[in-house]
Amino acid sequence: MNKVKVENIVSPGSTRLVDAEKYGAMKRAYLAVVPKSAPGATPAQMLERMLENLPQDLFPGGAKAGWWAKCVQLDLEAKGIVKRAKGSPVRLHQ
């Protein structure tokens, strides 16, 4: 199983190795639905849209999709690809 190193904006400098195939599939689905500009969308709204784009062999019935979406979100935020809008609830955009 190939691994990819992910960052976490909540824990700067901290990295974790995760399954590269699942990460890549979720990242593609995530970037396909995250709005290009503020105010963006909530993580729950994006997850709902992502579920239809995920490969069933990796995420059967959406299994573990929430965890992987959060993993990708925090990594993309740490890399500056995705940004949080100010205020509540959490809204994300590119």
Placement of each model-derived feature along the sequence:
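Long, low-complexity, charged/polar intrinsically disordered regions in eukaryotic proteins
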Residues: M1-A32
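Short amphipathic alpha-helical interface segments
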Residues: K22-Q56
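Short, positively charged loop/turn segments that connect secondary-structure elements
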Residues: L51-K70
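A short, conserved structural fragment
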Residues: Q73, E77-G87
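Short, cationic-aromatic polyanion-contact patches
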Residues: G87-Q94
